[in-house]
């Protein structure tokens, strides 16, 4: 399973937001692109991937929303459609930290921070990496674990208090890339390592 922990430092964790102004809603447009890159193929949904977005912009406590490809149905690639799924989740009361409550098929939510996600991953045997320009080259990883997770930040660098635990950093090159591009590169690299490179459109 490939897992992506996506940080949304300014996206609302409760209440509502306008589908007509996703950039002004804590850059929800970028978050939706990340989800699309993590889960969608040209003609289907990846059943080997999940994405957890961490909504940290308040009001109230942080909320995590999990999209599981293997259970997902009807996810469309446009940002507005994905944002609508997230907005529906925000209408629900926030579950306790560590308790995942399903809102619709393939989509569930829970309280908690990025540190909670890393703890859950560790409990499940997931090996986690942070995507960072200053990390080791992606090609330096030769033995890919069956369950692997990647942390994807937004415009704000991930700091030690966010992570709560030490984690190895991997670089995709010298330039800062959009999160959605990083996720696509990781998928292509993993597909290639498995002998099944992602086809060109």
Language-model region placement:
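Structured N-terminal alpha/beta-domain signature
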Residues: 129, 139-143, 151-153, 162-166, ...
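Structured adenosyl-cofactor binding patch, chiefly the S-adenosyl-L-methionine
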Residues: 156-201
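Long, charge-patterned amphipathic alpha-helical coiled-coil/hairpin "stalk" segments used as oligomerization
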Residues: 110-114, 131-139, 147-158
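Short glycine-/acidic-enriched loop or helix-start segments at secondary-structure transitions
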Residues: 16, 63, 139-141, 160-161
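A short acidic-Thr-Gly-centered motif at the start of a beta-strand
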Residues: 120-123, 139-145
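Short, glycine/charged-enriched secondary-structure capping and boundary segments
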Residues: 19-21, 67, 143-146, 164-166
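A generic structural signal for well-ordered alpha-helical surface patches
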Residues: 33, 149-150, 184-188
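RNA substrate-binding interface of SAM-dependent RNA methyltransferases
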Residues: 1-132
